[in-house]
Amino acid sequence: MAKNRRDRNSWGGFSEKTYEWSSEEEEPVKKAGPVQVLIVKDDHSFELDETALNRILLSEAVRDKEVVAVSVAGAFRKGKSFLMDFMLRYMYNQESVDWVGDYNEPLTGFSWRGGSERETTGIQIWSEIFLINKPDGKKVAVLLMDTQGTFDSQSTLRDSATVFALSTMISSIQVYNLSQNVQEDDLQHLQLFTEYGRLAMEETFLKPFQSLIFLVRDWSFPYEFSYGADGGAKFLEKRLKVSGNQHEELQNVRKHIHSCFTNISCFLLPHPGLKVATNPNFDGKLKEIDDEFIKNLKILIPWLLSPESLDIKEINGNKITCRGLVEYFKAYIKIYQGEELPHPKSMLQATAEANNLAAVATAKDTYNKKMEEICGGDKPFLAPNDLQTKHLQLKEESVKLFRGVKKMGGEEFSRRYLQQLESEIDELYIQYIKHNDSKNIFHAARTPATLFVVIFITYVIAGVTGFIGLDIIASLCNMIMGLTLITLCTWAYIRYSGEYRELGAVIDQVAAALWDQGSTNEALYKLYSAAATHRHLYHQAFPTPKSESTEQSEKKKM
Protein backbone atom coordinates (compact mmCIF):
# COMPACT_ATOMS: atom_id res chain seq x y z
CA MET A 1 0.00 0.00 0.00
CA ALA A 2 1.45 3.41 -0.93
CA LYS A 3 0.70 6.93 0.33
CA ASN A 4 2.05 10.28 -0.88
CA ARG A 5 3.07 13.03 1.51
CA ARG A 6 4.71 16.42 0.98
CA ASP A 7 7.79 16.64 3.24
CA ARG A 8 10.54 19.15 3.78
CA ASN A 9 13.86 17.55 2.93
CA SER A 10 17.24 18.06 4.60
CA TRP A 11 18.13 20.88 2.24
CA GLY A 12 15.16 23.12 2.86
CA GLY A 13 13.00 22.31 -0.18
CA PHE A 14 9.72 20.41 -0.41
CA SER A 15 9.43 17.13 -2.24
CA GLU A 16 6.78 14.52 -2.84
CA LYS A 17 7.59 11.35 -0.91
CA THR A 18 5.95 7.98 -1.45
CA TYR A 19 5.83 5.84 1.66
CA GLU A 20 5.34 2.10 1.24
CA TRP A 21 3.47 -0.05 3.75
CA SER A 22 3.88 -3.81 3.65
CA SER A 23 0.89 -6.07 4.02
CA GLU A 24 2.29 -7.37 7.30
CA GLU A 25 3.55 -4.23 9.05
CA GLU A 26 1.74 -0.94 8.60
CA GLU A 27 4.85 1.21 9.27
CA PRO A 28 6.37 3.92 7.05
CA VAL A 29 9.84 3.54 5.58
CA LYS A 30 12.48 5.18 7.75
CA LYS A 31 14.14 8.46 6.75
CA ALA A 32 16.96 7.98 4.24
CA GLY A 33 20.47 7.81 5.63
CA PRO A 34 23.84 6.06 5.32
CA VAL A 35 23.78 2.28 5.87
CA GLN A 36 26.93 0.28 6.50
CA VAL A 37 26.88 -2.84 4.32
CA LEU A 38 30.54 -3.89 4.61
CA ILE A 39 31.81 -4.15 8.17
CA VAL A 40 35.52 -4.42 9.00
CA LYS A 41 35.81 -6.28 12.30
CA ASP A 42 38.44 -5.80 14.99
CA ASP A 43 40.24 -8.96 13.83
CA HIS A 44 40.47 -7.43 10.29
CA SER A 45 37.95 -9.84 8.81
CA PHE A 46 35.01 -8.66 6.69
CA GLU A 47 31.28 -9.12 7.10
CA LEU A 48 28.53 -8.24 4.65
CA ASP A 49 25.23 -7.04 6.11
CA GLU A 50 23.05 -8.92 3.64
CA THR A 51 19.82 -7.90 5.36
CA ALA A 52 20.55 -4.20 4.91
CA LEU A 53 21.77 -4.73 1.35
CA ASN A 54 18.65 -6.70 0.40
CA ARG A 55 16.36 -4.12 2.01
CA ILE A 56 17.84 -1.32 -0.11
CA LEU A 57 18.55 -2.99 -3.45
CA LEU A 58 15.72 -5.53 -3.58
CA SER A 59 12.84 -3.15 -2.92
CA GLU A 60 10.10 -3.55 -5.50
CA ALA A 61 10.70 -0.13 -7.04
CA VAL A 62 14.36 -0.68 -7.96
CA ARG A 63 15.28 -4.38 -7.95
CA ASP A 64 14.78 -4.90 -11.70
CA LYS A 65 16.19 -1.52 -12.75
CA GLU A 66 19.66 -1.30 -14.29
CA VAL A 67 21.98 0.21 -11.72
CA VAL A 68 24.57 3.01 -11.75
CA ALA A 69 26.92 2.64 -8.77
CA VAL A 70 28.96 5.73 -7.87
CA SER A 71 31.77 5.30 -5.35
CA VAL A 72 34.37 7.63 -3.85
CA ALA A 73 37.62 6.07 -2.62
CA GLY A 74 41.06 7.27 -1.58
CA ALA A 75 43.23 8.09 1.41
CA PHE A 76 41.55 8.82 4.75
CA ARG A 77 40.77 12.38 5.93
CA LYS A 78 40.75 13.82 2.40
CA GLY A 79 37.08 14.86 2.28
CA LYS A 80 35.38 11.90 0.58
CA SER A 81 32.23 11.96 2.73
CA PHE A 82 32.14 15.78 2.47
CA LEU A 83 32.03 15.40 -1.33
CA MET A 84 29.40 12.63 -1.17
CA ASP A 85 27.04 14.95 0.71
CA PHE A 86 27.16 17.49 -2.10
CA MET A 87 26.33 14.63 -4.46
CA LEU A 88 23.28 13.93 -2.31
CA ARG A 89 22.21 17.57 -2.52
CA TYR A 90 22.40 17.38 -6.28
CA MET A 91 20.47 14.10 -6.49
CA TYR A 92 17.66 15.49 -4.32
CA ASN A 93 17.52 18.83 -6.18
CA GLN A 94 18.51 18.02 -9.77
CA GLU A 95 15.76 20.09 -11.30
CA SER A 96 16.75 23.18 -9.33
CA VAL A 97 19.35 25.52 -10.81
CA ASP A 98 20.60 26.40 -7.34
CA TRP A 99 20.90 22.80 -6.15
CA VAL A 100 23.77 23.56 -3.74
CA GLY A 101 21.23 24.95 -1.26
CA ASP A 102 21.17 27.83 1.17
CA TYR A 103 24.50 29.39 2.18
CA ASN A 104 23.62 29.14 5.88
CA GLU A 105 22.52 25.51 5.76
CA PRO A 106 24.78 22.86 7.41
CA LEU A 107 25.90 19.96 5.25
CA THR A 108 24.20 16.67 6.17
CA GLY A 109 24.01 13.15 4.79
CA PHE A 110 26.98 10.80 5.10
CA SER A 111 28.74 11.32 8.42
CA TRP A 112 31.75 13.63 8.14
CA ARG A 113 33.82 15.95 10.30
CA GLY A 114 37.09 17.81 10.34
CA GLY A 115 40.15 16.54 12.14
CA SER A 116 42.88 13.96 11.70
CA GLU A 117 41.10 10.76 12.79
CA ARG A 118 39.09 8.53 10.44
CA GLU A 119 35.30 8.77 10.30
CA THR A 120 33.98 6.23 7.75
CA THR A 121 34.75 2.52 8.12
CA GLY A 122 34.02 -0.30 5.68
CA ILE A 123 31.56 0.60 2.91
CA GLN A 124 28.40 2.65 3.37
CA ILE A 125 25.61 3.16 0.86
CA TRP A 126 22.80 5.69 0.91
CA SER A 127 19.57 3.95 1.85
CA GLU A 128 17.55 5.71 -0.86
CA ILE A 129 18.13 4.63 -4.45
CA PHE A 130 17.54 7.46 -6.92
CA LEU A 131 15.53 6.70 -10.07
CA ILE A 132 16.79 8.86 -12.94
CA ASN A 133 15.63 9.09 -16.55
CA LYS A 134 18.55 8.96 -18.97
CA PRO A 135 18.40 10.95 -22.26
CA ASP A 136 17.27 7.82 -24.14
CA GLY A 137 14.23 7.54 -21.83
CA LYS A 138 15.52 4.55 -19.85
CA LYS A 139 15.00 4.81 -16.10
CA VAL A 140 18.05 3.71 -14.08
CA ALA A 141 18.73 3.30 -10.37
CA VAL A 142 21.60 5.38 -8.96
CA LEU A 143 23.42 4.06 -5.89
CA LEU A 144 25.82 6.30 -3.92
CA MET A 145 28.61 4.53 -2.04
CA ASP A 146 31.08 5.95 0.49
CA THR A 147 34.20 4.01 1.49
CA GLN A 148 36.69 3.79 4.31
CA GLY A 149 39.83 5.79 3.64
CA THR A 150 43.02 3.92 2.90
CA PHE A 151 46.15 3.90 5.06
CA ASP A 152 44.70 5.01 8.38
CA SER A 153 46.47 4.00 11.59
CA GLN A 154 44.02 1.19 12.42
CA SER A 155 43.84 -0.62 9.07
CA THR A 156 46.20 -3.15 7.55
CA LEU A 157 47.23 -2.97 3.92
CA ARG A 158 44.88 -5.89 3.25
CA ASP A 159 41.97 -3.93 4.77
CA SER A 160 42.68 -0.95 2.53
CA ALA A 161 43.20 -3.10 -0.56
CA THR A 162 40.00 -5.08 0.02
CA VAL A 163 37.76 -2.05 0.57
CA PHE A 164 39.22 -0.18 -2.41
CA ALA A 165 39.13 -3.25 -4.67
CA LEU A 166 35.58 -4.20 -3.67
CA SER A 167 34.26 -0.67 -4.24
CA THR A 168 35.95 -0.60 -7.66
CA MET A 169 34.47 -3.99 -8.60
CA ILE A 170 30.96 -2.95 -7.54
CA SER A 171 30.93 0.60 -8.92
CA SER A 172 30.46 1.75 -12.49
CA ILE A 173 31.97 5.17 -11.64
CA GLN A 174 34.92 5.13 -9.24
CA VAL A 175 36.11 8.55 -8.03
CA TYR A 176 39.73 8.34 -6.88
CA ASN A 177 39.97 11.19 -4.36
CA LEU A 178 43.50 12.64 -4.13
CA SER A 179 45.04 15.65 -2.42
CA GLN A 180 47.03 18.33 -4.28
CA ASN A 181 48.57 16.15 -7.00
CA VAL A 182 48.74 12.71 -8.63
CA GLN A 183 51.99 11.29 -7.29
CA GLU A 184 53.77 8.13 -8.32
CA ASP A 185 52.85 6.34 -5.09
CA ASP A 186 49.16 7.14 -5.78
CA LEU A 187 49.47 5.33 -9.10
CA GLN A 188 51.32 2.41 -7.52
CA HIS A 189 48.63 2.02 -4.85
CA LEU A 190 45.97 2.17 -7.55
CA GLN A 191 47.83 -0.55 -9.46
CA LEU A 192 48.00 -2.74 -6.34
CA PHE A 193 44.35 -2.28 -5.40
CA THR A 194 42.97 -2.80 -8.90
CA GLU A 195 45.11 -5.90 -9.39
CA TYR A 196 43.76 -7.21 -6.07
CA GLY A 197 40.27 -6.66 -7.44
CA ARG A 198 41.05 -8.21 -10.81
CA LEU A 199 42.37 -11.36 -9.09
CA ALA A 200 38.96 -11.88 -7.49
CA MET A 201 37.06 -11.55 -10.77
CA GLU A 202 36.62 -14.09 -13.53
CA GLU A 203 39.08 -13.78 -16.39
CA THR A 204 37.73 -11.77 -19.30
CA PHE A 205 39.08 -10.28 -22.49
CA LEU A 206 37.26 -7.02 -21.65
CA LYS A 207 38.66 -4.39 -19.32
CA PRO A 208 37.49 -5.42 -15.83
CA PHE A 209 36.43 -1.97 -14.57
CA GLN A 210 34.52 0.93 -16.09
CA SER A 211 35.02 4.63 -15.30
CA LEU A 212 37.85 5.97 -13.16
CA ILE A 213 37.89 9.66 -12.29
CA PHE A 214 40.96 11.20 -10.68
CA LEU A 215 39.60 13.98 -8.47
CA VAL A 216 42.55 16.14 -7.43
CA ARG A 217 41.54 18.27 -4.43
CA ASP A 218 43.31 21.46 -3.28
CA TRP A 219 44.90 21.94 -6.73
CA SER A 220 47.46 24.75 -6.39
CA PHE A 221 48.73 25.14 -9.95
CA PRO A 222 45.88 26.58 -12.05
CA TYR A 223 48.46 28.58 -14.00
CA GLU A 224 49.81 25.26 -15.37
CA PHE A 225 46.54 23.34 -15.71
CA SER A 226 43.23 25.13 -15.16
CA TYR A 227 40.59 23.97 -12.71
CA GLY A 228 37.94 21.60 -14.04
CA ALA A 229 37.71 18.71 -16.49
CA ASP A 230 39.64 20.29 -19.38
CA GLY A 231 42.65 21.15 -17.25
CA GLY A 232 42.35 17.74 -15.60
CA ALA A 233 42.37 15.95 -18.97
CA LYS A 234 45.59 17.71 -20.04
CA PHE A 235 47.19 17.11 -16.65
CA LEU A 236 46.24 13.41 -16.61
CA GLU A 237 47.45 12.88 -20.16
CA LYS A 238 50.87 14.08 -19.05
CA ARG A 239 50.84 12.01 -15.84
CA LEU A 240 49.77 8.73 -17.50
CA LYS A 241 51.82 9.11 -20.66
CA VAL A 242 54.04 6.12 -21.44
CA SER A 243 57.33 7.12 -23.04
CA GLY A 244 60.40 5.20 -24.12
CA ASN A 245 62.77 7.06 -21.80
CA GLN A 246 60.77 6.05 -18.70
CA HIS A 247 61.96 3.25 -16.45
CA GLU A 248 60.21 -0.06 -17.16
CA GLU A 249 58.59 -0.01 -13.71
CA LEU A 250 56.96 3.37 -14.41
CA GLN A 251 55.78 2.20 -17.82
CA ASN A 252 54.22 -0.96 -16.34
CA VAL A 253 52.23 1.02 -13.75
CA ARG A 254 50.70 3.23 -16.44
CA LYS A 255 50.01 0.36 -18.83
CA HIS A 256 48.30 -1.56 -16.03
CA ILE A 257 45.98 1.34 -15.17
CA HIS A 258 45.04 1.82 -18.84
CA SER A 259 44.35 -1.92 -19.15
CA CYS A 260 41.96 -1.95 -16.17
CA PHE A 261 39.53 0.88 -16.92
CA THR A 262 37.35 1.59 -19.95
CA ASN A 263 37.24 5.35 -19.30
CA ILE A 264 39.77 7.44 -17.37
CA SER A 265 39.31 11.16 -16.70
CA CYS A 266 40.39 13.83 -14.23
CA PHE A 267 38.97 16.93 -12.52
CA LEU A 268 41.06 19.57 -10.75
CA LEU A 269 39.32 21.16 -7.76
CA PRO A 270 40.62 24.19 -5.80
CA HIS A 271 41.11 24.36 -2.03
CA PRO A 272 37.87 25.10 -0.11
CA GLY A 273 39.59 27.74 2.02
CA LEU A 274 41.34 28.17 5.35
CA LYS A 275 38.09 28.39 7.33
CA VAL A 276 37.21 24.88 6.20
CA ALA A 277 40.68 23.52 6.98
CA THR A 278 41.26 25.14 10.38
CA ASN A 279 37.85 25.67 11.98
CA PRO A 280 37.07 22.72 14.31
CA ASN A 281 33.39 23.69 14.34
CA PHE A 282 32.96 23.86 10.57
CA ASP A 283 29.61 22.24 9.72
CA GLY A 284 29.57 22.58 5.94
CA LYS A 285 27.87 25.96 5.55
CA LEU A 286 28.55 27.36 2.08
CA LYS A 287 29.19 30.84 3.46
CA GLU A 288 32.45 29.58 5.00
CA ILE A 289 33.68 27.95 1.77
CA ASP A 290 35.68 29.87 -0.85
CA ASP A 291 33.69 31.03 -3.87
CA GLU A 292 36.21 29.48 -6.28
CA PHE A 293 35.60 26.07 -4.72
CA ILE A 294 31.80 26.45 -4.89
CA LYS A 295 32.03 27.61 -8.51
CA ASN A 296 33.96 24.48 -9.53
CA LEU A 297 31.85 22.26 -7.28
CA LYS A 298 28.77 23.37 -9.24
CA ILE A 299 30.55 22.13 -12.38
CA LEU A 300 31.97 18.91 -10.90
CA ILE A 301 28.83 17.33 -9.43
CA PRO A 302 26.64 17.62 -12.58
CA TRP A 303 29.67 16.51 -14.63
CA LEU A 304 29.64 13.33 -12.53
CA LEU A 305 25.92 12.75 -11.98
CA SER A 306 23.89 14.37 -14.75
CA PRO A 307 21.71 11.82 -16.61
CA GLU A 308 23.93 11.85 -19.71
CA SER A 309 27.05 11.15 -17.58
CA LEU A 310 25.72 8.09 -15.76
CA ASP A 311 27.37 4.77 -16.69
CA ILE A 312 25.23 1.69 -16.15
CA LYS A 313 27.10 -1.04 -14.29
CA GLU A 314 28.37 -3.77 -16.62
CA ILE A 315 30.17 -7.05 -15.94
CA ASN A 316 31.58 -8.97 -18.91
CA GLY A 317 29.58 -6.70 -21.22
CA ASN A 318 26.24 -7.46 -19.50
CA LYS A 319 24.24 -4.66 -17.89
CA ILE A 320 23.54 -5.33 -14.20
CA THR A 321 20.32 -4.69 -12.28
CA CYS A 322 20.05 -3.94 -8.56
CA ARG A 323 19.09 -7.58 -8.01
CA GLY A 324 22.20 -8.74 -9.88
CA LEU A 325 24.42 -6.30 -7.96
CA VAL A 326 23.36 -7.92 -4.68
CA GLU A 327 24.51 -11.32 -5.95
CA TYR A 328 27.86 -9.93 -7.14
CA PHE A 329 28.32 -8.20 -3.79
CA LYS A 330 27.80 -11.54 -2.01
CA ALA A 331 30.05 -13.46 -4.39
CA TYR A 332 32.91 -10.97 -4.18
CA ILE A 333 32.87 -10.70 -0.39
CA LYS A 334 33.07 -14.50 -0.09
CA ILE A 335 36.31 -14.42 -2.06
CA TYR A 336 37.80 -11.78 0.24
CA GLN A 337 36.58 -13.63 3.33
CA GLY A 338 38.47 -16.76 2.22
CA GLU A 339 42.16 -17.44 1.80
CA GLU A 340 42.20 -17.98 -1.98
CA LEU A 341 43.75 -14.59 -2.68
CA PRO A 342 47.30 -13.72 -1.69
CA HIS A 343 47.55 -11.09 1.02
CA PRO A 344 48.91 -7.81 -0.35
CA LYS A 345 52.18 -6.78 1.24
CA SER A 346 53.78 -3.49 2.11
CA MET A 347 56.68 -2.30 -0.02
CA LEU A 348 59.07 -3.05 2.86
CA GLN A 349 57.77 -6.60 3.34
CA ALA A 350 57.75 -7.35 -0.39
CA THR A 351 61.28 -5.95 -0.79
CA ALA A 352 62.53 -7.84 2.28
CA GLU A 353 61.11 -11.11 0.94
CA ALA A 354 62.66 -10.58 -2.49
CA ASN A 355 65.95 -9.63 -0.83
CA ASN A 356 66.04 -12.78 1.32
CA LEU A 357 64.93 -15.06 -1.52
CA ALA A 358 67.72 -13.65 -3.70
CA ALA A 359 70.23 -14.40 -0.92
CA VAL A 360 68.86 -17.97 -0.63
CA ALA A 361 69.19 -18.47 -4.40
CA THR A 362 72.78 -17.16 -4.44
CA ALA A 363 73.87 -19.36 -1.52
CA LYS A 364 72.18 -22.46 -2.98
CA ASP A 365 73.72 -21.82 -6.38
CA THR A 366 77.18 -21.60 -4.78
CA TYR A 367 76.63 -24.96 -3.03
CA ASN A 368 75.41 -26.50 -6.29
CA LYS A 369 78.38 -25.34 -8.34
CA LYS A 370 80.97 -26.56 -5.83
CA MET A 371 79.25 -29.94 -5.40
CA GLU A 372 79.23 -30.33 -9.19
CA GLU A 373 82.99 -29.79 -9.17
CA ILE A 374 83.35 -32.54 -6.55
CA CYS A 375 80.92 -35.23 -7.74
CA GLY A 376 79.32 -33.91 -10.93
CA GLY A 377 78.46 -35.91 -14.03
CA ASP A 378 82.03 -36.44 -15.31
CA LYS A 379 83.62 -36.91 -11.87
CA PRO A 380 84.54 -40.41 -10.58
CA PHE A 381 82.84 -42.13 -7.67
CA LEU A 382 83.55 -40.53 -4.28
CA ALA A 383 83.55 -42.43 -0.99
CA PRO A 384 80.29 -41.72 0.92
CA ASN A 385 82.12 -40.46 4.02
CA ASP A 386 84.17 -38.02 1.95
CA LEU A 387 81.01 -36.85 0.17
CA GLN A 388 79.30 -36.19 3.50
CA THR A 389 82.32 -34.25 4.78
CA LYS A 390 82.34 -32.07 1.65
CA HIS A 391 78.58 -31.56 1.95
CA LEU A 392 78.81 -30.33 5.54
CA GLN A 393 81.72 -28.06 4.66
CA LEU A 394 79.94 -26.50 1.66
CA LYS A 395 76.66 -26.21 3.56
CA GLU A 396 78.43 -24.23 6.26
CA GLU A 397 80.00 -21.98 3.60
CA SER A 398 76.60 -21.39 1.97
CA VAL A 399 74.98 -20.50 5.30
CA LYS A 400 77.86 -18.13 6.01
CA LEU A 401 77.40 -16.55 2.57
CA PHE A 402 73.65 -16.10 3.22
CA ARG A 403 74.29 -14.46 6.58
CA GLY A 404 76.90 -12.19 5.03
CA VAL A 405 74.49 -10.67 2.50
CA LYS A 406 72.89 -7.39 3.62
CA LYS A 407 69.19 -8.12 3.88
CA MET A 408 66.12 -6.07 4.76
CA GLY A 409 63.70 -7.19 7.45
CA GLY A 410 66.12 -7.96 10.28
CA GLU A 411 67.48 -11.17 11.82
CA GLU A 412 64.11 -12.51 12.95
CA PHE A 413 62.57 -12.09 9.49
CA SER A 414 65.58 -13.80 7.83
CA ARG A 415 65.53 -16.84 10.12
CA ARG A 416 62.84 -18.71 8.18
CA TYR A 417 64.71 -18.10 4.93
CA LEU A 418 67.86 -19.54 6.53
CA GLN A 419 65.85 -22.65 7.46
CA GLN A 420 64.54 -22.80 3.89
CA LEU A 421 68.13 -22.65 2.57
CA GLU A 422 69.29 -25.47 4.87
CA SER A 423 66.30 -27.63 3.90
CA GLU A 424 66.88 -27.11 0.17
CA ILE A 425 70.61 -27.88 0.51
CA ASP A 426 69.80 -31.14 2.33
CA GLU A 427 67.44 -32.11 -0.50
CA LEU A 428 70.18 -31.39 -3.04
CA TYR A 429 72.61 -33.52 -1.00
CA ILE A 430 70.25 -36.52 -1.22
CA GLN A 431 70.22 -36.15 -5.01
CA TYR A 432 74.03 -36.00 -5.09
CA ILE A 433 74.22 -39.18 -2.97
CA LYS A 434 72.04 -41.04 -5.48
CA HIS A 435 74.02 -39.64 -8.39
CA ASN A 436 77.31 -40.62 -6.75
CA ASP A 437 76.09 -44.15 -5.93
CA SER A 438 75.11 -44.71 -9.55
CA LYS A 439 78.81 -44.37 -10.46
CA ASN A 440 79.83 -47.19 -8.10
CA ILE A 441 80.31 -50.33 -10.25
CA PHE A 442 79.47 -52.55 -7.28
CA HIS A 443 76.32 -50.58 -6.58
CA ALA A 444 75.31 -50.87 -10.25
CA ALA A 445 75.99 -54.64 -10.17
CA ARG A 446 74.15 -55.15 -6.89
CA THR A 447 70.88 -56.34 -8.41
CA PRO A 448 72.28 -58.91 -10.90
CA ALA A 449 74.82 -60.13 -8.31
CA THR A 450 72.07 -60.64 -5.75
CA LEU A 451 69.89 -62.49 -8.25
CA PHE A 452 72.84 -64.69 -9.31
CA VAL A 453 73.47 -65.57 -5.65
CA VAL A 454 69.79 -66.50 -5.19
CA ILE A 455 69.90 -68.66 -8.34
CA PHE A 456 73.11 -70.37 -7.18
CA ILE A 457 71.83 -71.02 -3.64
CA THR A 458 68.47 -72.39 -4.81
CA TYR A 459 70.27 -74.55 -7.41
CA VAL A 460 72.52 -76.09 -4.74
CA ILE A 461 69.63 -76.59 -2.28
CA ALA A 462 67.48 -78.16 -5.01
CA GLY A 463 70.29 -80.58 -5.88
CA VAL A 464 70.95 -81.57 -2.27
CA THR A 465 67.28 -81.97 -1.31
CA GLY A 466 66.57 -83.92 -4.51
CA PHE A 467 69.49 -86.23 -3.76
CA ILE A 468 68.22 -87.03 -0.25
CA GLY A 469 64.63 -87.48 -1.43
CA LEU A 470 63.01 -84.18 -0.33
CA ASP A 471 61.35 -83.70 -3.67
CA ILE A 472 58.85 -81.06 -2.49
CA ILE A 473 61.60 -78.73 -1.23
CA ALA A 474 63.64 -79.45 -4.36
CA SER A 475 60.66 -78.53 -6.55
CA LEU A 476 60.08 -75.33 -4.55
CA CYS A 477 63.74 -74.34 -4.92
CA ASN A 478 63.60 -75.07 -8.65
CA MET A 479 60.52 -72.87 -8.94
CA ILE A 480 62.24 -70.01 -7.02
CA MET A 481 65.33 -70.46 -9.20
CA GLY A 482 63.20 -70.28 -12.35
CA LEU A 483 61.37 -67.17 -11.17
CA THR A 484 64.66 -65.52 -10.19
CA LEU A 485 66.11 -66.34 -13.62
CA ILE A 486 63.05 -64.79 -15.31
CA THR A 487 63.42 -61.76 -13.00
CA LEU A 488 67.09 -61.42 -13.97
CA CYS A 489 66.24 -61.55 -17.67
CA THR A 490 63.42 -59.03 -17.15
CA TRP A 491 65.76 -56.69 -15.26
CA ALA A 492 68.36 -56.94 -18.05
CA TYR A 493 65.69 -56.14 -20.67
CA ILE A 494 64.47 -53.12 -18.68
CA ARG A 495 68.03 -51.80 -18.36
CA TYR A 496 68.61 -52.27 -22.06
CA SER A 497 65.30 -50.93 -23.43
CA GLY A 498 64.30 -48.35 -20.81
CA GLU A 499 60.74 -49.72 -20.72
CA TYR A 500 58.84 -50.77 -17.57
CA ARG A 501 61.11 -48.61 -15.42
CA GLU A 502 58.80 -48.84 -12.41
CA LEU A 503 58.98 -52.65 -12.53
CA GLY A 504 62.77 -52.34 -12.67
CA ALA A 505 62.64 -50.15 -9.55
CA VAL A 506 60.66 -52.88 -7.76
CA ILE A 507 63.30 -55.49 -8.65
CA ASP A 508 66.06 -53.14 -7.44
CA GLN A 509 64.21 -52.60 -4.13
CA VAL A 510 63.90 -56.34 -3.48
CA ALA A 511 67.55 -56.94 -4.42
CA ALA A 512 68.63 -54.06 -2.16
CA ALA A 513 66.67 -55.56 0.73
CA LEU A 514 68.43 -58.92 0.27
CA TRP A 515 71.83 -57.27 -0.14
CA ASP A 516 71.67 -54.74 2.72
CA GLN A 517 69.64 -56.57 5.32
CA GLY A 518 70.60 -60.16 4.73
CA SER A 519 67.24 -61.00 6.27
CA THR A 520 64.71 -63.17 4.50
CA ASN A 521 61.81 -61.67 6.48
CA GLU A 522 62.87 -58.15 5.58
CA ALA A 523 63.28 -59.09 1.94
CA LEU A 524 59.88 -60.80 1.81
CA TYR A 525 58.24 -57.77 3.50
CA LYS A 526 59.77 -55.39 0.95
CA LEU A 527 58.79 -57.71 -1.86
CA TYR A 528 55.20 -57.74 -0.59
CA SER A 529 55.11 -53.93 -0.16
CA ALA A 530 56.57 -53.34 -3.60
CA ALA A 531 54.20 -55.84 -5.20
CA ALA A 532 51.20 -54.22 -3.51
CA THR A 533 52.30 -50.78 -4.65
CA HIS A 534 53.05 -51.78 -8.24
CA ARG A 535 50.37 -54.45 -8.78
CA HIS A 536 49.29 -52.84 -12.06
CA LEU A 537 52.83 -53.29 -13.42
CA TYR A 538 52.71 -57.02 -12.68
CA HIS A 539 49.42 -57.36 -14.58
CA GLN A 540 50.86 -55.32 -17.43
CA ALA A 541 53.97 -57.52 -17.66
CA PHE A 542 52.18 -60.85 -17.04
CA PRO A 543 48.56 -60.50 -18.25
CA THR A 544 46.10 -63.18 -17.08
CA PRO A 545 44.24 -64.99 -19.91
CA LYS A 546 40.54 -64.11 -20.10
CA SER A 547 39.33 -67.71 -19.71
CA GLU A 548 41.51 -68.26 -16.65
CA SER A 549 40.24 -65.12 -14.92
CA THR A 550 36.64 -66.20 -15.67
CA GLU A 551 37.27 -69.64 -14.13
CA GLN A 552 38.77 -68.04 -11.02
CA SER A 553 35.75 -65.77 -10.56
CA GLU A 554 33.38 -68.75 -10.97
CA LYS A 555 35.32 -70.73 -8.34
CA LYS A 556 34.99 -67.79 -5.93
CA LYS A 557 31.22 -67.75 -6.48
CA MET A 558 31.06 -71.51 -5.80
From Swiss-Prot:
GDP binds at residues 77-82, 148, 217-218, 276, 279. The modification N6-acetyllysine is found at residue 395. Mg(2+) binds at residue 81. Phosphorylated. Phosphorylation, by different kinases, of the N-terminal hypervariable region (HVR) regulates the ATL1-mediated membrane tethering step. Residues 521-558 are annotated as: Autoinhibitory domain. Residues 471 are lumenal. This is Atlastin-1. It comes from Homo sapiens.
